[in-house]
């Protein structure tokens, strides 16, 4: 934050060029979670962010939200539902859903084992040098 640039940064933050939609989830009449999503070309849905309050982990609100949104996408005749970005071990759960695919840099693939391994490797990267080595190895694997 630089002094005297507050007005520009406030304007920048207010101008969101993506027309996000929101699903808000309630428990006992209180909002406890939300998903931010975007519909592209009236045919594909991309979730951008999911957040919840962690007060009732046994509710499984993340799984509930994902299944609800997939069902909503099907009922609204969207072709694809993209469950946001995938990286690090925290994203492995995304591969449990039927029809799972991920972008490998060249094409969409459904290799869940490779996806899980890539997520685990992401978690272990701590330096730019490690990232560079990882990227070289990754693209060598995917480009033959």
PLM features per residue range, with description:
Residues 83-144:
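Terminal substrate-recognition subdomain of acyl/acetyltransferases
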């Amino acid at each position: 934050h630089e002094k005297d640039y507050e007005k520009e940064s406030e304007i920048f933050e207010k101008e969101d060029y993506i027309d996000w939609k929101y699903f808000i989830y309630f428990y006992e009449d209180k909002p406890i979670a939300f998903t931010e999503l975007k519909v592209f070309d009236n045919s594909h849905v991309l979730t951008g962010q999911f957040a919840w309050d962690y007060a009732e982990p046994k509710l499984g609100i993340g799984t509930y939200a994902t299944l609800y949104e997939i069902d909503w996408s099907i009922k609204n005749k969207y072709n694809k539902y993209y469950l946001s970005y995938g990286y690090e071990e925290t994203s492995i759960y995304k591969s449990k859903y039927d029809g799972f695919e991920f972008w490998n840099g060249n094409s969409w693939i459904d290799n869940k084992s490779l996806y899980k391994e890539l997520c685990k490797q992401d978690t272990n990267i701590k330096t730019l040098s490690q990232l560079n080595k990882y990227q070289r190895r990754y693209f060598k694997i995917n480009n033959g």
